[in-house]
């Protein structure tokens, strides 16, 4: 009886592979890529909070938070890391607000960055689908979901009611995109804004626009919020920012990364490296003084950060020690992993 069932199962598997192609069904243990492939986020603290050393490839990421909290900065750092590792990046600028000079300061190669500023939400999502399906893109950032305005709303009159249009658009798009994103190992980052539900007496009134589909399809959801202002004398030079992993399908969620986002510079690599090294006792802290290998490197956090910025050899050494202490790799090269990607047929 058991042999009959095995023969029947083998016949069914062969039929499925014949109809839908090799690899359409397999035993979980046979799948070659069991280890989660990642791309560094551009922030060591965020790599640790994500639990797998970066953004998982072939997955959807949602980055949301209040205005000017650092959502686009976090996403641009991811693009810079992809390009640094030999990958190709695209930016769908639905808000029409990308600053090329700022992106360049964060390490983005703007000459190689693919940019689209769509007129409608449908156009933006179709462009994203075409790029992902090509199999030649490693990361695509959509900024933002709230700005993906349906064509019917743009063509209609100001003030006209269009209930649920954007939610339906996002639901349909994600149903179509999720499969090709996974097959081509593309990272899709959706930046989102915050809205408040009217009449909520208890609980959190905050929600994100675009319906519930993105919440379900996202493997990782990051909440970005400003914690405090950073001052140098009387001048405000940046913000202390908390990035909370509110959803994570590849590692335990609810971890928090604290980073310094400096105006005109982006995430301070020195600041997060200093904090993480102190936490692992790789850099000593006595009162206001910081020390490394019996040598004092600065009084006060800002001075210690400046010392590290002025001594790149020491920073590279500490970075390696911190990565080893937290079990984070240097990030794999994208070009090698991309060889296994397949190009998907575009819809006619």
From Swiss-Prot:
ATP binds at residues 65-72. Belongs to the RecA family. This is Protein RecA. GO terms for cellular component: cytosol. One of its GO terms (biological process) is DNA repair. InterPro entries: AAA+_ATPase, DNA_recomb/repair_RecA, DNA_recomb/repair_RecA_CS, P-loop_NTPase, RecA-like_C, RecA-like_N, RecA_ATP-bd, RecA_C_sf. Keywords: ATP-binding, Cytoplasm, DNA damage, DNA recombination, DNA repair, DNA-binding, Nucleotide-binding, SOS response. It comes from the Bacteria. One of its GO terms (molecular function) is single-stranded DNA binding. It comes from Enterococcus faecalis (strain ATCC 700802 / V583). SMART domains: AAA.
């Amino acid at each position: 009886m058991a042999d009959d069932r095995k023969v029947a199962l083998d016949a069914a598997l062969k039929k499925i592979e014949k109809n839908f192609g090799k690899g359409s069904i397999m035993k979980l243990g046979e799948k070659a890529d069991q280890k989660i492939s990642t791309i560094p986020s551009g922030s060591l603290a965020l790599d640790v909070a994500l639990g797998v050393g970066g953004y998982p490839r072939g997955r959807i990421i949602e980055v949301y938070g209040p205005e000017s909290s650092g959502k686009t900065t976090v996403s641009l750092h991811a693009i810079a890391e992809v390009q640094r590792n030999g990958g190709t990046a695209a930016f769908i600028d639905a808000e029409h607000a990308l600053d090329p000079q700022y992106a360049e300061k964060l390490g983005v190669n703007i000459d190689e960055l693919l940019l689209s500023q769509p007129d409608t939400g449908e156009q933006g999502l179709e462009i994203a689908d075409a790029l992902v399906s090509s199999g030649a893109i490693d990361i695509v950032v959509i900024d933002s979901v709230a700005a993906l305005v349906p064509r019917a709303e743009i063509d209609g009159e100001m003030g006209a009611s269009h209930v649920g249009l954007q939610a339906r658009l996002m639901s349909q798009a994600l149903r179509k995109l999720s499969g090709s994103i996974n097959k081509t190992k593309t990272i899709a980052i959706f930046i989102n804004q915050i809205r408040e539900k009217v009449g909520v007496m208890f609980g959190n009134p905050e929600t994100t626009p675009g319906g519930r589909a993105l919440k379900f399809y996202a493997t990782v959801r990051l909440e970005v919020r400003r914690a405090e202002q950073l001052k140098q004398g009387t001048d405000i030079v940046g913000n202390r920012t908390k990035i909370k992993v509110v959803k994570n399908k590849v590692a335990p969620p609810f971890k928090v990364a604290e980073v310094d986002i400096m105006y005109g510079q982006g995430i301070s690599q020195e600041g997060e490296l200093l904090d993480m090294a102190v936490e692992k006792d790789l850099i000593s802290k006595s009162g206001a003084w910081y020390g490394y290998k019996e040598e004092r490197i600065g009084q006060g956090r800002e001075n210690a950060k400046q010392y590290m910025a002025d001594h790149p050899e020491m920073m590279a050494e500490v970075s390696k020690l911190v990565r080893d202490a937290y079990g984070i790799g240097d990030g794999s090269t994208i070009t090698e992993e991309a060889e296994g990607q397949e190009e998907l047929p575009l819809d006619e």
